[in-house]
């Protein structure tokens, strides 16, 4: 099992991707322990001095003015967790649940939440034992924290609800017992600290970010294959074109296209003296469009990584000053807007890919047989595959509508503006699936087109991309059941067979090579 030491507030995107992809063994940097203890001491001092502080000895939301007596404080925290566990929908998978839990551990360990180290260690023990709480995927509006899903996460600590252990859903107490763990009792402030926060919104956005990064890389390879299949020019990828514009994302993407295409190939040499002056935009403007996508991807990554390391609790405990301050760090507007940007990225990757597919189908544009098949008429070839790509691209356009501009007041108008960040992040998963389907069809189409070019070879990287596909999907000499071939290409894309052809870490890394 992968080992990960959490230095609170310093998680990297690579570490978060590892957490998402596979189980991890968590340890917490012991240097943060004193800060955690000081925040608890501050909470205890407020109680000892009989001061009123929101979330410590008051009700919540519109009931914040209700003072809670000391003998009810433990009950208050338990009641908060069980009452707020009101989510609906399918349970999140282990990968998403683990990522949420690690994000919560990271945030609580910063030492501003007034929660005991023992509670944080109890969460760590769950991650290390691979016991995952039942968290429904819907029920948060991304303001006042992701209350419902984080309440479902916290139920497991109390021995309530359900948990998945070794692939089986069990009552929480039974799952804990199988791993030799015990339920805990929450002290003042601790239930609220567990529930308040943007960790679910951030985890949803992180998955979308990881998907978008992989798909952008795959799109560069697919787009390069289409350039070769359509006998397109390499000149639009010349570094000089992009340097004079100065858009860094465009500069960096053009460099990746040049890396994939190389200076020339047998295919490019075959039409070096052709009369064609300019290629259609879907071929020629790939660096401009994909470069803009990369710029948005990088911005979203910066925002989401900042939030992954943020303290998004409320109220916050500033132990050195002995103060507890109510604020609004639980409002996930930055994450919602970042997710909206990622939605644009995914929609545009798919939209441009679909246009290249359509170009390859059109014999007047590509100089290839209509619908990429011999004996057209008897055979329909890729005709309906392009229709499928168009359907997916169109669906993504609807899904790309910004969620962050929506808001519905909650909690009797106390929480009168919300971010809708969870919905903004969750729809990215469906958009990524759609975009992967479009790219799969382009991969199939471009390889079929190259197969019509009299055995001429492309660049080494693109030849490898063809070999990978042809190991699973044969050349189309006549019509056959098409869907399994798309599924095979989708599976190869999901396994990162194309994105891995680019140099490691080259998508989000900035070059500064103007």
Swiss-Prot record:
Catalytic activity line of the entry: L-histidine = trans-urocanate + NH4(+)
Location of the protein in the cell: Cytoplasm
A GO molecular function held by the record: histidine ammonia-lyase activity
5-imidazolinone (Ala-Gly) crosslink site(s): 143-145
Cytoplasm found in the keyword field: yes
Record has Lyase as a keyword: yes
GO CC entries: cytoplasm
PTM entry text: Contains an active site 4-methylidene-imidazol-5-one (MIO), which is formed autocatalytically by cyclization and dehydration of residues Ala-Ser-Gly.
Gene3D superfamilies: Fumarase/aspartase (Central domain) (1.20.200.10), Fumarase/aspartase (N-terminal domain) (1.10.275.10)
Key words of the record: Cytoplasm, Histidine metabolism, Lyase
Main location: cytoplasm
GO biological process: L-histidine catabolic process to glutamate and formamide; L-histidine catabolic process to glutamate and formate
Modification type 2,3-didehydroalanine (Ser): residues: 144
EC class name: lyase
EC assignment: 4.3.1.3
Signal sequence range: none
HAMAP family, per the entry: His_ammonia_lyase
Family: Belongs to the PAL/histidase family.
PANTHER family in alphabetical order: HISTIDINE AMMONIA-LYASE (PTHR10362)
UniProt-recorded name of the protein: Histidine ammonia-lyase
